[in-house]
């Protein structure tokens, strides 16, 4: 795909293609807010127990083997929407022709917001805290590998309006890759009750593992899939296993097709942040925080380092000779 883009770059055909791409991109940005607003059921991946949902089955309280106190969310240091600079249109160029790490911009989207925190872990820590810590570590790893243009993206407000803000910010920043950072939960029907440090909570030890999502409606799906597979490959190389529950009927409306059984890449075609960004986009669920054992791992600096190393390795391979691994796609 990227080789074909270079082949026609100097021709009249290439000019017409770029002109149509620019027009389509501008139209997409204008239509974005109404589109995102209409997608009300999309609050990213499902997150946490619903106040309206059925009460989970009760399980006798038990003391965890290892305790972990709720930690305050780290102080944000990120790109704010109000501070965005002039738009960069480099995202319209083929990725292979501009994959110089020092100039290649990866936007790390911190899933959820301080006002709408996403899932709640088994020990009652908000997902947003996990997302921010991990995104900050990934940013450090990427910059250490020479990806100096990496940007951390924080949005504010409620979940649904923030979807449009994320897409608009990524498009405005001229990102070459968009990676949204999340931590996983399960549907309400799979949750059980327990107590931790005298407080009621919910857990499900049934599933664990990371998962990677892409949208086949993204304007550059093939490159999205490529980067997602590289992340999955790198996570697997670190000894991690992907979550396999998304293909099961028990997941209900959260069921998704598995696109690569080797790397744990799933399709999530209608997710706004994956389909409406104008650059390749991937969502990483780093692990399950509703699983009591995995939550402890996700809360450790060691696990954040492992995940950060995997993402950095994927980015380095992505910026290597593209023709070497585009074939299987």
Residue ranges of predicted features:
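N-terminal secretory signal peptides that target proteins for export/translocation
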Residues: 1-17
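Catalytic-site microenvironment of enzymes
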Residues: 12-26, 32-329
């Amino acid at each position: 795909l990227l080789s074909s883009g270079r082949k026609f770059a100097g021709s009249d055909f290439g000019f017409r293609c770029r002109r149509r791409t620019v027009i389509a991109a501008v139209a997409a940005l204008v239509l974005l807010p109404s589109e995102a607003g209409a997608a009300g059921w999309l609050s990213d991946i499902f997150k946490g127990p619903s106040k309206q949902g059925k009460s989970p089955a009760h399980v006798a309280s038990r003391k965890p083997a290892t305790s972990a106190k709720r930690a305050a969310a780290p102080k944000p240091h990120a790109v704010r929407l109000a501070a965005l600079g002039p738009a960069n249109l480099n995202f319209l160029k083929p990725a292979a022709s501009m994959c110089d790490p020092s100039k290649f911009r990866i936007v790390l989207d911190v899933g959820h917001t301080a006002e709408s925190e996403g899932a709640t872990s088994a020990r009652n820590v908000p997902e947003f805290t996990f997302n921010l810590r991990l995104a900050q570590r990934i940013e450090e790893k990427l910059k250490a590998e020479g990806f100096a243009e990496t940007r951390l993206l924080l949005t504010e407000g409620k979940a649904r309006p923030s979807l449009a803000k994320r897409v608009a910010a990524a498009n405005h920043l001229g990102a070459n890759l968009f990676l949204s950072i999340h931590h996983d939960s399960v549907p309400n029907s799979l949750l059980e009750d327990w107590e931790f440090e005298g407080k009621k909570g919910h857990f499900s030890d049934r599933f664990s593992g990371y998962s990677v999502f892409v949208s086949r409606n993204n304007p550059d799906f093939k490159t999205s899939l490529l980067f997602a597979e590289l992340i999955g490959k790198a996570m697997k190389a670190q000894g991690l296993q992907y979550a396999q529950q998304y293909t099961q009927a028990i997941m209900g409306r959260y069921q998704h097709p598995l696109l690569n059984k080797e790397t744990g890449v799933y399709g999530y075609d209608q997710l706004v942040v994956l389909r409406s960004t104008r650059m390749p986009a991937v969502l990483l669920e780093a692990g399950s925080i509703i699983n009591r054992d995995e939550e402890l791992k996700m809360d450790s600096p060691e696990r954040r380092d492992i995940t950060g190393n995997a993402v950095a390795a994927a980015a380095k391979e992505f910026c290597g000779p593209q023709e070497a691994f585009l074939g299987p796609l």
